[in-house]
Each structure stands twice: as C-alpha cells, then as structure tokens.
Amino acid sequence: MLADELTTKARQLGVRHTATISGVKSVYYEYPSDGSSAETVVLIHGYRGNHRGLEAIGGGLGKYRVLMPDLPGFGESMELTGVHDLDAYANWLEQFLITLGADKTSHVVGHSFGSLVVGLYASRRSSKSVILINPVSAPALSGPRAFLTKITSAFYHLSRSLPEGFANWLLRSPIAVMVMSSVMAKTTNRSLRRWIHKQHLDNFSDFASVKVAAEAYDASISTDLSKMAYLITSPVLIIAAVLDDITSIQVQRDVAETYPNATVVELPNVGHLVHYEAPAEAAIHISAFVESNK
C-alpha cells in the first residue's frame, strides 16, 4: 500500500485518549489489533512532528495494538512545566508506558529525535525490543549536511531573542517548512513529494510555543545514540536509510557494532523521511523483529 493509503487506514482505526503524564495532559492514539497478535508497539515521533507523522507505518502494523502519543508540547499534548530537554522527554516516556501498563510488555519505536527519546529511555529500562528508525547516531553538526544544521541552529537561537509573535511567525513560516521538506524528501515521485510537502505543511508547525520549539531543538542536538548504545541491552533493530541527511549510512553501520544486541536493515534510495517514503517496508521490518522478540 502507498503511504497515503496506509495513513488513511490508520486514521480510520485510531481512538483518541488522554492521560496525565508528568503532571500534564497528554494525548495519545490507540490503533487496535486486528486480533491476530497480543503484542503492543509504541511509536514515538520526531522533532516538530506529532503522532500523525507515523500513522503510515502504524497502518502497516495492523496485527498489533499500536500506541502513538504526541510528545509534550507537540500535537495535542500540553507542554511540560520545566525545560523540554532530552531527560525530561525520556522521563515522560517512562511514565507514559508505566501509566498504560506497557513498560515491560511493549516494543518501542522511535524515529529521528524520537530515537533519542527512546534510546535514553531504553538505556535505563528494558523492553521486549527497541526499534530505531534513522536514529541520530552522530553529533548533528557532523552529519552529511552539517552546514545546513548550523544554519538551522542559528535560526532557532535567533528565535529566542525575537518578540514572541514574530518568532512564532518565523518558525511556522510555510517557506521555512517547504525548504526543509524539499531538502529532506529524496523520492522522485512527484505525487509522493506533493503529499510529503502537504504533511509537513499540515503538521510541522504543530508545537505549543517558541519555548518548546527552541528547547526541543536543543534537546535534539544535545547528544546522539553513539553515546548510549552500549547501555541498551534490549534487542535493537536499526532501520537506516542510505540517503539520510542526518546520519550517514557508514556511521549507522559503525555505531550498530557498539550495541550489545543490534540488527541493521538498510533501505536504499530513501532519505530521512522513511515514515513517508517507505512506511510499508519499515512496517514489514518492524513486524518481523517483533515476531522474533515476543
């Protein structure tokens, strides 16, 4: 199935829930199993995203119960009362899983910034399995497009010094969103590119405040998986796109060797947007890994 078809399939099944996690109202969506498996898969989205960004992958995981929260300050979830750093997000994830009784029984998936949140959580607690999609496995400023990352960093730091209204307009600017989307998308399929751009225009500005956007950005470049891989004892699947702009494929291969128990799957002709460009393939690999780690 195509990405838009998988997304539609998931949205038809999704049930909205709210829970108080880390003292704030948090929203998550549950996609019931078709009855063929009792396993639970939890998907954690990336920076400036929300649960909708991973629905195409969720649509390919129909045999499982799937949970997709909006991280604090993004989507429909309220922002935290303190700083939105990586430790706060990992603590929130831990409390989320405990509250839902899924801390010891779930397979936890993280994409991009979500891989850092899941990785830090997994370095402290074990899960049935951990799946990292295009994990941030090297310092952000040393990736294939380090120059663009430096410009982006300056962009977010500038936003902090501007009046709230202007900073909000700047960060949510459709032009800025389209530049990012155009750089990240690797597919040559025009229809898919248009769909990807629409997803970003609809969802990439879904953050609660300039404070959240700036603090979470700092969190996204504060560390990388190479610094915590050796602490993650759960079985790990790394789904790495060969054309990823954030972490090169060779770095993904090298860092994978430092996990106690990791498997790497490489996706050719795909970039950072695996969840849009190859969600069906990602779901197939996730399903196979879940089945081998029940």
Give the residues covered by each predicted segment:
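Flexible "cap/lid" loop of the alpha/beta hydrolase fold
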Residues: 130-164
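Catalytic active-site module of serine/aspartate enzymes centered on a nucleophile-bearing elbow/loop
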Residues: 260-294
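Conserved alpha/beta-hydrolase "acid-adjacent" motif
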Residues: 245-251
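Active-site loop/oxyanion-hole signature of alpha/beta-hydrolase fold enzymes
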Residues: 24, 68-113, 143, 284
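Short beta-strand/loop motif that positions the catalytic acidic residue
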Residues: 232, 238-240, 244
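Conserved HGGG/HGGXW glycine-rich cap/lid loop of the alpha/beta-hydrolase fold
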Residues: 24-78
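Conserved alpha/beta-hydrolase "nucleophile elbow" surrounding the catalytic nucleophile
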Residues: 45-47, 110-112, 241
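Conserved alpha/beta-hydrolase catalytic His-Asp/Glu region
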Residues: 166-230
